[in-house]
């Protein structure tokens, strides 16, 4: 369900039959100068079904062509929120961008969620990755490749999707 909050709002639609997300449009024009973020209203409030969440994303065309993105990267609209859905748009480019009234400014999808109960434990189960953080899975792949090749190698040099060893 959705509620139209002002006369400039547009009911969302999917751009194509294969679109995963629906477009949200601005209700008013606004200029966003370089390295500035401004809130852009959609004029819509949603009743997201219980057990679901609405995720709001930047439109790829804005990022690729205009240097625009959502200031919070991904908006999370909970099922109990009933206010206007807005997008805070950040301009990463060197030129002022003029958002026009009726312009597609973001895209959103409504997806099911899993609510979990947290259980505090003394130890977590072990995995091959363990506590390895950023970049650790790439190192694991290199180690597997070398183990499968056998022999002694002095240097690993990743290039694209290939790994060279001597």
Regions found by a protein language model. Give the residues of each.
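DUTPase catalytic domain/fold
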Residues: 1-152, 159-166
